[in-house]
Every structure is written in structure tokens, then in C-alpha cells.
Amino acid sequence: MRRATQLFGICWLLCLLVACGESHFMTDASYRSRVEQDFQQKKALMPQGELFAILDDASLSTYEQEALEFLYAYMPLADITDYPGEFHLMNIRASQRAAEEMPWGKNIPEDLFRHFVLPVRVNNEQLDSARVVFYKELKDRVKSLSLYDAILEVNHWCHEKAVYMPSDARTIPPLAPVAFAYGRCGEESTLLVAALR
């Protein structure tokens, strides 16, 4: 009996250590609580189906869980229904990777990262995997630059990829101007924001 109690105690301590070692996406507990409430309200609007099933994945880190809840709390309803949770998780992991690997990534204030880097949507474009594709293409080009110079370099890269051409069509996704080598004003700005993220 004593051995079972010791084993239980050791397992409990290990679980506690693992849980304490995980980083939060939102370090401010009161803000985290507000996001959780907003997420629960959004979830209540959409009770049918498995729209939030990704959050049941036990392998998610605390950071990923909180980032998903943040995105779901504030994204348009159509982005919840039109794109699977795995898509949003892929983008969370890609943004976290960039923040960890770029020398200035850890210096981005948490609130700026949360509201201006993490979100996928820029405009009314269809969402795509631009964040992953652009990171692979841009990381070596900007990794040794200051944040200021990296921003300028990404802007130059966008100009290399696409030039302005007017059209009346809906805003195309960020990968499209690269493929077509042109885009409208909104498409070029969407390309730049997606590349900067």
C-alpha cells in the first residue's frame, strides 16, 4: 500500500511539473479569462457539429489550446465553418515557429503578436497556407536582419513577386499574386501582411 502511495505521489508530481512547464499564449490571467468567456459565447452560437473538435485533442499544448480559443473567439463565423481546426492549428504552429526562430521574434509584444501576427485573415480573401509557404521562402532572407530591415526586405520580396493590376474580382488569397505575378491594391496589401506574419 505504501509503495502504491509513493508511486501515485511521484506520478502526481511529474504531471504537475509538466503542466507548470508549459507556456501560456496569454500570460495575463484576467485577459485569458475574458478570452475564455468570449470563446464560450461564440461556441454557444454554433452548438451543432464538430466545429471545435480540435480543442479535444489531448496532445495540444497549453499555448496551442489558448491560441485556438483566442482565434475562435474573435474570428468571423464563416472562418470557423469553412476551415477545419487543423488549418488554424497549422497557422498557430507556423507563427509560433517564426517567433521562436527569428532573432527578433521574442521581442514582439504579446498583444501585438496576438492581434496582428497570429490571425490568418487580412481582408475578405480565401484563406490558404501562405504563412507556411512564405516562411520557407523568406526565413533565410531575413534571419540575419534587424526587425526594421526584415520588414523592408519582405516588402521588396513582395514587389518581386507581384505588381499592381486592377480588376473587379474578389480579393484573391495571398499565394495567388505570387503565382500570377500581379494583384489589385487589396491583394498586394494582403500579400504583404501575410508575408510579414
Where are the language model's segments positioned?
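Active-site neighborhood of thiol-dependent amide/isopeptide-bond enzymes
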Residues: 140-197
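N-terminal accessory/pre-domain segments preceding catalytic cores
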Residues: 20-151
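Bacterial N-terminal signal peptides that target proteins for export
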Residues: 1-9
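Bacterial N-terminal signal peptides
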Residues: 8-17
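Short hydrophobic/aromatic-rich motifs at helix boundaries and adjacent loops
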Residues: 5, 126-127, 163-166
